[in-house]
């Protein structure tokens, strides 16, 4: 009887033998990438046909940037003055105009609006010194899709085009209004 009880207990314990649960002490360390963020001055110039950012430069020849810097490139809010006098104030991403900003050319053309990877892209307003004004969408730097162009001074002063654009030109449906009220 005792032998049978012993065998019975062994049979009950049998499923638990050989089933060993091993929990290893594993330490998981997060990978932390340290980004160098700062505010400062950078200079952009062409080297072997490619634009590059440098900490030292010549203000008379290079483009000068003042603002937020991340990993050696403009990133965040800043201002760049180009060698020809053109100026951009706004957001940057990875060294390019990206987001909301204002671009003013040496001829005093002024664009206020969205930029995407360095180009006018999205909703914006372009004004010229003679009073011409375009309000609408841009695609890769050109007037595109829908916009309103109002002529300022000069021969066409007071005239307006409301309609579609493609690649910077009137294209598709639109209405042209002369200063005397005639429409086409």
Roles of regions detected by a PLM:
Residues 2-21:
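Classical Sec-dependent N-terminal signal peptides that target proteins to the secretory pathway
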Residues 18-184:
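Glycine/tyrosine- and acidic-biased, solvent-exposed loop/turn segments at the edges of beta-strands
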């Amino acid at each position: 009887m005792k032998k049978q009880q012993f065998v019975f207990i062994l049979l009950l314990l049998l499923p638990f033998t050989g089933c060993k649960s091993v929990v290893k002490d594993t330490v998981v360390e997060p990978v932390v990438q340290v980004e160098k963020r700062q505010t400062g001055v950078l200079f952009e110039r062409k080297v072997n046909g490619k634009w590059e950012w440098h900490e030292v430069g010549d203000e008379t020849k290079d483009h000068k940037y003042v603002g937020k810097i991340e990993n050696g490139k403009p990133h965040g809010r800043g201002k760049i003055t180009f060698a020809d006098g053109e100026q951009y104030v706004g957001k940057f991403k990875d060294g390019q105009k990206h987001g909301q900003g204002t671009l003013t050319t040496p001829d005093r053309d002024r664009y206020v609006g969205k930029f995407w990877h360095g180009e006018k892209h999205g909703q914006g307003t372009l004004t010229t010194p003679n009073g011409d004004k375009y309000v609408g969408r841009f695609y890769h730097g050109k007037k595109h899709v829908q916009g309103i162009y109002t002529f300022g001074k000069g021969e066409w002063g007071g005239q307006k085009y409301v309609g579609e654009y493609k690649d910077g030109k009137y294209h598709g449906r639109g209405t042209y209004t002369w200063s005397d009220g005639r429409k086409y």
